[in-house]
Amino acid sequence: MGYLVKLACGLLLPLATADVNLAQQPFGEFEWQPKFDTPSGDHTSCAVSRLSAYEVGEGPVSFSLSPTEHPEIPKLSTINSTVWEQWEFDAVSESGTGSVLMGFSRDPSYSFFGQGNLRVEFYMTLEDGTRIQELEYTESSTVIDCPDSIRGIWNSSDRSYAFEISRDMQRARVWWDTGREKGSIAIESTTTPHLADGEIWPPEEGESRVKKSWPSVKLSPGLYMSQPIAGGKVTAHVQIGKKTMSITGYGAHSRLWAENSWFKICRGWQIMRGFLGPYTISYWRPLSRLDDWVPYFAAHLFKHGRLVFTSQVGAPSQQVDYTQFHSDFSGNVSGSLADKATGRVLEFVSPSTGKTWRFHHRHFAKMFEMGFGGGRGLTGFLDEIVGGEVGTDEEFTGRGFSEQVLLPDEIKQWQIWVVYGIGFLGRWKNTVTNLVLSIW
C-alpha cells in the first residue's frame, strides 16, 4: 500500500479523505514521467468510483445521458452484463510515422475469457515501422473525481496504467508501466470540449441549452460520446525493452459509453481525425445494427481552435449543414481486408454560409489490422491530409489517422477470442494471432 500513498499523494495529488485502496503494482520512481504543474485546490472532497475485475451489478444500473454532467466522470454507477464505458487517448507524430492509441475500459462484453471486465487496449506504431497491439486485463479500476482534475488508475500486480485530465479539459496525461513497456503521453488541448452533436461544454456564457428529443451525447442508437479534447499538441515518450521513442505531434481524447457491446449496437464504423494548418477534424460514422444498416454522423471542424462547423447529417441539404464522405482508390496503402480504399475525401458543407471545406485523407501507413473472416474486420491507418476551404487559396497539409470497420452479421465467441482475447496469450499473442488469421 506504500506505493499507493506515493501515487495518490505525489503523482496524483493528495486525497485527504478519499478512501482509495489500490494495493497493486507500485509505479516506482517513473523517471520517464514528464513533470507538470498541477493547480492547487481543496482535495478533501474527491468522489471515488472503484471496480474490481469481476465485479458486476445485478439488474439495471444508472446510465447517464445528461448534457450538463461533467464529460469525464463515470457515466455508469457500475457495470452489469451489457453496459460499458471507455476513456480513449491517441497521438500521431508530426512525421506521421509514429502513433499511440490507448483505451481504458470498464466493459463486460468479453467476460467469457475469464479475465474480468477491466482492460486497456494499446496500439502503437514506432518510427521504424514496428507495430504493437496489446490487450491487457487488470485487477482493479479506480476513477477519482476531484475539484481540479479527474484521475483514473487501471492496476494489477505486475502492470499499471493511469490518466489525469484537468477539470477544464485543457490538459491530459497518461502513464503506463508493464515491466517490458513504459511510457507517457501529454496532451495540451487547442480545441473546445463538446458533445456528440457539437454542443460546446459547458455552454458559453449567456447561452441556453436547446431542448432536444435526441440527447446531445447520443452518437447512434445505444452509443454515446463526448470529446473533451478533439485536438491538441502532444508529446509522448515510450520505452519498449531497449527501444525508445519520443513523439512530438498531435492528439486527442474521447469518452464513449454504450448500452451493449460494439457487436450488438454497430455493424461497423468510420472514424477520422486530422490536424493540418489551423484545422482540427473529427468525424465519426457508426453504422447501426439496432437501426438496421442506417449510418449516423458526428462531424466537427475547428479552425484556430474555434468550432466552425458541426453536423449530424450525412446527405445533401439546402437547409442544414451536412457532410459528404467518399472513398478514394488512387493511393498506394490499403488494408488487406475487403475494403481496399487508399483514403477518403471528406467535405463539410454549410448552405447557410455558402462555405465548403474539403479534406483528402491519404493512407500513409497501417496502424493495426484484425480480421474476422470473409473480408470483414478492423483496420487503422496513419494518414497524410491535404485540404482547406474550397474557393480560397487554402491548401494545408498535415497528419491524422482513420479507422475502417465492418463487423460480421454473426460472430462466434472463439472468433472474438482470436481478435479481442489476444491479451489472454500474453507476450505470444501477436505471433499466435497472425498464425491463426493467416490460415483462417
Curated annotation (Swiss-Prot):
Keywords, in A-Z order: Glycoprotein, Isomerase, Signal
Gene Ontology molecular-function annotations: isomerase activity
Signal sequence segment: 1-18
The protein's enzyme class: isomerase
Pathway, per record: Mycotoxin biosynthesis
InterPro entries for this protein: DA_C
Enzyme Commission designation: 5.5.1.-
Recorded phenotype for the gene knockout or disruption: Completely abolishes the production of myceliothermophin E, but leads to the accumulation of its C18 keto acyclic precursor.
Catalytic reaction list: (5S)-5-(2-methylpropyl)-3-[(2E,6R,8E,10E,12E)-6,8,10,12-tetramethyltetradeca-2,8,10,12-tetraenoyl]-2,5-dihydro-1H-pyrrol-2-one = (5S)-3-[(1S,2R,4aR,6R,8aS)-2-(but-2-en-2-yl)-3,4a,6-trimethyl-1,2,4a,5,6,7,8,8a-octahydronaphthalene-1-carbonyl]-5-(2-methylpropyl)-2,5-dihydro-1H-pyrrol-2-one; (5Z)-5-(2-methylpropylidene)-3-[(2E,6R,8E,10E,12E)-6,8,10,12-tetramethyltetradeca-2,8,10,12-tetraenoyl]-2,5-dihydro-1H-pyrrol-2-one = myceliothermophin E
Glycan attachment positions: N80, N155, N332
Pfam families cross-referenced by the UniProt entry: DA_C, DA_N
Family: Belongs to the Diels-Alderase family.
Summary of the function given for this chain in its UniProt record: Diels-Alderase; part of the gene cluster that mediates the biosynthesis of myceliothermophins, mycotoxins that contain a trans-fused decalin ring system connected to a conjugated 3-pyrrolin-2-one moiety and that have potential anti-tumor properties. The polyketide synthase module (PKS) of the PKS-NRPS mycA is responsible for the synthesis of the octaketide backbone. The downstream nonribosomal peptide synthetase (NRPS) module then amidates the carboxyl end of the octaketide with a leucine.
The protein, known as: Diels-Alderase mycB
Organism (species): Thermothelomyces thermophilus (strain ATCC 42464 / BCRC 31852 / DSM 1799) (Sporotrichum thermophile)
Biological classification of the source: Eukaryota, Fungi, Dikarya, Ascomycota, Pezizomycotina
